[in-house]
């Protein structure tokens, strides 16, 4: 079978390797025929050598849809012929976060495409506890969007109650676009999405995000003032992964507000911690998704 291996930064090899066999499956394993793969922004970071937690060589691909080829004897969640996706986290199931259901921050977490091989190959074996059967009628293309949608759903939950709040999303790539849509769906009063790319901002507008701002042309402070007036904004999502982005969010957001860091930063930003403390800003991290947000993603994509 074909397999794409990121051997080192900027070096992908396409190899012919032996395909896994149904006869070799363990009782809780599922053999998949990969049909669609999304290219995540984090994987682009890995390709360029600026992702802080990529172990080379590695097979990329963690946003995907597939058809079940065969299952182990104890598998009940799916059967041959089912169209599925799967969560990419490999968790221990034993540590304190896992026991709380927060396997996304497992003490021994490995993520396929970064610390373990992913789905950029014709056939792939996964454990059944990570399988999710796609709803009837959902296309393979949409199925590959489940994982990034789940990431966005989880990120907005990390921002707390957004109902009635003004929200800024910095970064209008795929995840930023989805975060903005979820913020809107969760009752935000107004959602402003920013980027330096007019192309990305146009896509956001086509997806229903009315208020956009190119911060390469108009500073965030000016654009936010124009949109929100004296109300300021009370929640922000950093999805660009650059120092200037999070610094401007900190400097412009209302006192006592929340900033959620969604992006993977290639370099640690230099931040004014005195300013952060003086303004009682809350900075929350977010890591992929959990079962609830993965389920929410299925419902959201099906609504599309």
Describe each PLM feature range.
Residues 7, 20-21, 56-61, 112-116:
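Short Gly/Pro-enriched turn/cap motifs at secondary-structure boundaries
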Residues 22-37, 50-96, 130, 135-137:
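Glycine-rich beta-strand-centered segment in the early N-terminal region that forms part
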Residues 87, 123, 144, 172, ...:
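Glycine- and other small-residue-rich loops at beta-strand/loop junctions that grip anionic moieties
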Residues 92-170:
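NAD(P)H dinucleotide-binding glycine-rich loop of Rossmann-like/cofactor-binding domains
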Residues 138-217:
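Mid-domain Rossmann-like dinucleotide-binding core that forms the NAD(H)/NADP(H) cofactor-binding site
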Residues 159-163, 202-282:
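Glycine-rich cofactor phosphate-binding loops and adjacent beta1-alpha1 units
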Residues 197, 265, 289:
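Residues in the short beta-alpha loop(s) of Rossmann-like NAD(P)-binding domains
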Residues 293-300:
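Conserved small/polar residues in nucleotide/adenosyl-binding loops
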């Amino acid at each position: 079978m074909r397999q794409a291996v990121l051997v080192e930064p900027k070096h992908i090899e396409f190899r012919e390797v032996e395909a896994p066999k149904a006869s070799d499956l363990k009782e809780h394993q599922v053999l998949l025929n990969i049909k669609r793969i999304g290219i995540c922004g984090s994987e682009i970071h890995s390709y360029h050598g600026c992702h802080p937690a990529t172990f080379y060589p590695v097979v990329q691909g963690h946003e995907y849809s597939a058809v079940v080829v065969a299952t182990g004897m104890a598998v009940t969640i799916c059967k041959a012929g089912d169209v599925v996706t799967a969560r990419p986290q490999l968790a221990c199931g034993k540590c304190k976060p896992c026991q709380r259901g927060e396997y996304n921050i497992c003490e021994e977490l490995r993520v396929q495409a970064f610390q373990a091989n992913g789905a950029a190959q014709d056939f792939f074996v996964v454990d059944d506890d990570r399988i999710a059967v796609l709803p009837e009628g959902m296309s393979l293309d949409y199925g590959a969007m489940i994982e990034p949608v789940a990431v966005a759903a989880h990120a907005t939950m990390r921002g707390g109650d957004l109902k009635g709040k003004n929200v800024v999303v910095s970064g209008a790539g795929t995840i930023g676009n989805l975060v903005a849509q979820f913020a809107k769906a969760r009752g935000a009063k107004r959602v402003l999405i920013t980027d330096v790319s007019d192309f990305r901002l146009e896509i956001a507008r086509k997806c229903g995000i009315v208020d956009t701002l190119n911060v390469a042309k108009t500073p965030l402070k000016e654009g936010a003032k124009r949109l929100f007036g004296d109300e300021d904004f009370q929640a922000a999502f950093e999805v660009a992964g650059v120092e200037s982005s999070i610094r401007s969010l900190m400097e412009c957001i209302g006192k006592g507000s929340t900033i959620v860091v969604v992006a993977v930063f290639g370099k640690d930003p230099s931040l004014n911690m005195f300013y952060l403390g003086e303004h009682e800003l809350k900075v929350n991290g977010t890591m992929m998704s959990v079962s609830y947000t993965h389920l929410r993603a299925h419902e959201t994509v099906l609504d599309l």
